[in-house]
């Protein structure tokens, strides 16, 4: 029997690219959807992947991308109007008679969350569950390891590790592990995974200070964990030219971490190993890859750049996130609340964590949600 053809949105991104690679290794035909052609998409084409250019806000382009497709990986846009793109995808999926969608969601997904992206993610969870004839699977990771390693150059070059989450702890999961999990869900399909949700995590809970110690052991020199107030994030983001919308959301996730959202009910699952047969990689393993990247190498040029940028950061005015949110007219609920403060969220997510004790047997190997 021929394997079903699978569409991967965000196919050149942090999780999309690992999904494409894993599916190809499993022998599945893949259509990689990108929003622009570049060296990464060209490399996919050289490897025999069908690449299509489409706008996630355009229902017609999405319908064209979905024609002849049985299953799809949906990666949401990190943009203020993400909900519109999700609605366009839902319309196209129904018209194209898609069999199964695997959706990247969030552990924090909550109707009243102060981060607009998380409010909208909750709506997408509900919307995709109601697409007629389309099976729906959610995987809802917590904190990505990438979020804790994007500033590893500060550690490598200056011997400091910025900590924005206080003493809060999370089990950071790598992009590669998320890609492997999504690929299994897509490959095994709706007969095994329709209507289910899975939370991939790293293998252990870590605080910012513990991450700093791991990074120090990798680099071979002292790294000082530097606790920073959340307003400093606005200065760093502006100095580095980062998207204010993304960082506006990230500040709330740092507060989530402080409050124990990511360590709730133990905070660690075995989903990665249960689904893929391989244990989740450690934070140390992921950090070693980042430490070897060009931006973190201890060259004279990188050292000078890091020194200048670090010393200039306090002089930047920084993003005023609340003002920026108002200017963008981002939707807000009447009474915003962090996920951990909501009884409905706690009940639903406690149940999800408890499900690991109630395995689903597929007939081929054990599955634990």
Segments (PLM) and residue ranges:
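Oxidoreductase cofactor-interface core, primarily capturing Rossmann-like NAD(P)-dependent enzymes
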Residues: 1-43, 57-60, 67, 79-80, ...
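Residues lining the SAM
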Residues: 9, 75, 104, 277
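N-terminal Rossmann-like NAD(P) cofactor-binding module of classical short-chain dehydrogenase/reductase
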Residues: 66, 70-73, 102
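Short secondary-structure boundary segments
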Residues: 105-106, 261
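A hydrophobic C-terminal alpha-helical subdomain
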Residues: 234-369
């Amino acid at each position: 029997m021929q394997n079903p053809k699978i569409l991967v949105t965000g196919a050149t991104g942090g999780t999309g690219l690992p999904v494409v690679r894993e599916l190809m290794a499993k022998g599945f035909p893949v259509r990689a959807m990108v929003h622009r052609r570049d060296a990464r998409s060209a490399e996919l084409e050289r490897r025999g992947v069908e690449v299509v250019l489409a706008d996630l806000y355009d229902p017609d382009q999405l319908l064209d991308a979905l024609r002849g497709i049985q299953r799809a990986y949906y990666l949401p846009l990190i943009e203020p109007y993400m909900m519109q793109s999700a609605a366009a995808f839902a319309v196209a999926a129904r018209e194209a008679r898609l069999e199964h969608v695997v959706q990247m969601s969030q552990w924090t997904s909550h109707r009243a969350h102060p981060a607009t992206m998380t409010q909208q993610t909750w709506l997408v969870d509900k919307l995709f569950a109601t697409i007629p004839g389309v099976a729906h699977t959610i995987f809802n990771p917590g904190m990505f390891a990438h979020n804790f390693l994007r500033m590893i150059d500060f550690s490598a070059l200056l011997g400091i590790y910025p900590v924005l989450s206080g003493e809060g702890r999370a089990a950071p999961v790598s992009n590669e592990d998320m890609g492997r999990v999504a690929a299994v869900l897509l490959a095994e399909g709706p007969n095994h995974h329709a209507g289910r949700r899975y939370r991939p995590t790293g293998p252990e809970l870590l605080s910012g200070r513990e991450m700093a110690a791991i990074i120090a052991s990798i680099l071979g020199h002292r790294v000082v964990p530097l606790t920073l107030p959340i307003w400093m994030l606005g200065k760093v983001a502006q100095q580095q030219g980062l998207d204010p919308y993304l960082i506006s959301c990230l500040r709330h996730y740092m507060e989530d971490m402080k409050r124990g959202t990511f360590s709730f009910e133990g905070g660690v699952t075995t989903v990665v190993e249960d689904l893929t047969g391989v244990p989740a990689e450690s934070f140390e393993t992921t950090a070693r890859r980042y430490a070897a990247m060009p931006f973190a190498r201890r060259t004279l040029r990188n050292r000078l750049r890091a020194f200048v940028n670090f010393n200039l950061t306090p002089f930047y005015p920084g993003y005023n996130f609340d003002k920026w949110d108002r200017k963008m007219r981002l939707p807000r609920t009447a009474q915003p609340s962090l996920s951990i403060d909501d009884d409905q969220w706690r009940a639903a997510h406690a149940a999800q964590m408890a499900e690991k004790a109630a395995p689903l047997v597929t007939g081929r190997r054990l599955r634990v949600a």
